């Protein structure tokens, strides 16, 4: 595309009262970049031989290469938060793992996917914490970063990561005070009765899943190689300093 020099104006000479925005400008902000990250659980299907599975186990799923096709279609990015990883999983939009139609399959990173499988999170693997002001996506991005830091060779980095994770997990006490429990599997029983997804967003507002990092050690190693390679842990302190001391 060429630019006509006569179309270029001096910004100082523009009459702001006569400026007309282009039609459709800003319309992209009317739609959220990612869907809301809500609690859900796997649909209970009679004769399901793998009730704890978090991905489809139908032979046709692997036989037809649906897992790989779904990942490629989504560019290996999570539908909920946009995180890129070759280690991402496949989520069934209807929560029914027998439904393996291509349009029902989307890519989800292991943390966001965990939100969709509260009933499959056993005691000790995760808790439900009250974290007001922190979106589910941000809570997962923070936990992912913590999990990578926990594998650092720097003992100070590991200690800081533990403190941050413990702070997040400690907010499970607020959940227990309000709900009587902080176990994901118990919350999943309430989800079965609450089919309205929009209602879930209101009822469970400000609640987040805080995961046990031990279950994600293999993922954390891959995340460090893939998405954090250009920003290794040993540079985080400098980045924090630069951001906090950036000129106004």
What are these regions (language model features)?
Residues 1-56, 114-248:
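Extended charged
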Residues 58-110, 116-130:
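Histidine-centered nuclease catalytic patch
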């Amino acid at each position: 595309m060429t630019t006509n020099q006569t179309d270029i104006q001096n910004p100082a000479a523009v009459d702001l009262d006569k400026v007309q925005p282009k039609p459709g400008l800003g319309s992209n902000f009317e739609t959220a970049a990612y869907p809301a990250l809500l609690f859900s659980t796997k649909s209970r299907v009679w004769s399901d031989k793998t009730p704890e599975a978090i991905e489809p186990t139908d032979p046709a799923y692997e036989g037809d290469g649906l897992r790989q096709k779904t990942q490629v279609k989504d560019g290996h990015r999570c539908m909920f938060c946009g995180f890129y990883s070759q280690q991402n999983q496949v989520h069934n939009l209807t929560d029914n793992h027998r439904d393996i139609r291509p349009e029902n399959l989307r890519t989800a990173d292991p943390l966001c996917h965990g939100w969709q499988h509260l009933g499959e999170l056993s005691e000790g693997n995760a808790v439900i914490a009250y974290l007001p002001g922190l979106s589910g996506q941000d809570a997962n991005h923070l936990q992912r970063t913590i999990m990578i830091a926990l594998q650092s060779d720097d003992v100070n980095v590991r200690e800081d990561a533990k403190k941050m994770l413990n702070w997040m997990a400690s907010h499970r006490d607020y959940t227990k005070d309000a709900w009587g429990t902080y176990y994901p599997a118990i919350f999943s029983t309430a989800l079965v009765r609450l089919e309205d997804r929009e209602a879930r967003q209101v009822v469970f507002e400000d609640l987040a899943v805080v995961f046990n990092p031990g279950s994600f050690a293999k993922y954390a190693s891959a995340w460090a190689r893939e998405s954090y390679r250009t920003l290794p842990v040993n540079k985080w302190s400098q980045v924090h300093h630069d951001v906090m001391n950036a000129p106004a």
